[in-house]
Structure formats: C-alpha cells, structure tokens
C-alpha cells in the first residue's frame, strides 16, 4: 500500500490480523484527508471492469428523524462525493445493505436513494430475514453479496464502504464483532486486504447504522 497523507504528513500503513488474514490499513481522522487517496484510487482503475460497493444506512445517507425530506434521511456529503465520482468515471455502483429484504422495503429504499440523489446504480442487495439474527450473520451476508456481484458482473470490487466493521470485515462470532466495536469507531479506516477479492475496504465513523 502506498503511503497517504494524514494532516499533511505521510501516514504509514500498519498491519491488522483478522481470522488469520492480514490487512494493511491507514487511519484518517476526517474525510478531508481521506478524499484525495480515495479519488486517486478510483481514477487509477479501469472503469469497464471495476465496481464500488456502498452500504446505505449512515454511509450513503444519514438517517435523521428531525427532517421530513427523503423519508427522514439526508445524503452523507463525503460519501456522495465518492458516489458522484464513480458515476463520472463510469464505475459501476452497487448497494449492499442489512435492511430486510421485502417488496415493500425494496420499493421504499429505491425511493429514498432516488430522493437523496443516489438513484443511479447497477444493483441493490438487501438482507434476507434468515441472516438478520446476529452481526456475524449480517457480515456473512454482505461478504456473500460482494462475491455474487463480482461473479455475475465479471467486475473487480475496487472499494467497499460502510460504517460498521461488519460491512467491511468477515466476522465469525459475536465476540469477535464486539471486539471490533470497541476499537476506534470515530475515525475513517482504509484497508487493503492481503490476498482478498476486494481491493480496498473503507470503514466510516460509526453512526449506528447496520
């Protein structure tokens, strides 16, 4: 992994081990310092065989019960910048969410994405009820969804972003999930998995999404 700037200084990648798998990672304290590395990553890939995956809640949008617009949600400005850059570069966008899969939820979610300005995407993957029993099972669903996207589309996922550790890392148990929840959840973590299918993983500050 190349070094990236954090507050004007070169940030040195560190190694994290999860389930025996090694990840190079850099922590950013704010989106401003992260924006250029993300932009450089997306501009460096071939858009014809690349894809980006976003979580929905507290990632592409922020749920806010105090507002009436867009079904009580507003766009997340930083992630929307990355979303719009993907569209300009013609990189396929996919959404993978732990929202329960149903016809009603699907219709509501598509309307909400359209309302916040994120209505252009290749596919929306929602979570079957059988996976919504634990954080570990949700992480399994999301991993399977990403694998399915790459298999069907013949595209490489170059960036996968979400606000929960289960959005980005495969967790095998609730205990392991809880251990990660206790880590620094107020920073941005940019991971480069070693020998994994997704090129970059982005963990956003935890806003209580799923």
Locate each region found by the language model:
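Non-catalytic pre-domain segments flanking phosphatase-related domains
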Residues: 1-54
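C-terminal cap/substrate-recognition subdomain and adjoining C-terminal extension
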Residues: 2, 8-11, 104-210
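Acidic/histidine-rich, surface-exposed loop or edge segments in extracytoplasmic proteins
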Residues: 16-22, 61-67, 89, 126
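Second-shell loop/turn segments in exported
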Residues: 22-27, 65-72, 94-100, 131-136
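Structured segments of extracytoplasmic/periplasmic soluble domains
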Residues: 41, 63, 82-92, 112-116, ...
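A general structural motif
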Residues: 47-49, 90, 155-157
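Asp-based phosphoryl-transfer active-site loop
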Residues: 48-66
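Short, acidic loop-to-helix structural element flanking the phosphoryl-transfer center
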Residues: 67-94, 101-107
């Amino acid at each position: 992994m190349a070094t990236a700037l954090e507050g004007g200084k070169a940030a040195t990648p560190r190694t994290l081990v999860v389930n025996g798998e090694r990840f190079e990672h850099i922590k950013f304290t704010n989106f401003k310092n992260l924006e250029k590395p993300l932009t450089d990553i997306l501009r460096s890939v071939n858009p014809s065989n690349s894809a980006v995956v976003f979580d929905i809640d507290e990632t592409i949008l922020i749920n806010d019960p105090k507002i009436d617009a867009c079904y009580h949600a507003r766009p997340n400005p930083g992630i929307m910048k990355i979303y719009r850059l993907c569209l300009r570069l013609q990189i396929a966008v996919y959404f993978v969410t732990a929202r329960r899969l149903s016809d009603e939820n699907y219709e509501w979610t598509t309307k909400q994405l359209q309302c916040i300005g994120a209505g252009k995407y290749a596919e929306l993957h929602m979570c079957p009820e059988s996976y919504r029993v634990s954080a570990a099972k949700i992480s399994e669903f999301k991993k399977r969804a990403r694998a399915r996207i790459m298999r069907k589309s013949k595209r490489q996922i170059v960036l996968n972003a979400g606000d929960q550790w289960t959005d980005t890392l495969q967790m095998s148990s609730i205990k392991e999930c809880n251990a990660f929840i206790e880590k620094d959840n107020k920073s941005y973590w940019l991971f480069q998995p070693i020998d994994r299918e997704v090129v970059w993983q982005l963990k956003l500050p935890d806003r209580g999404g799923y």
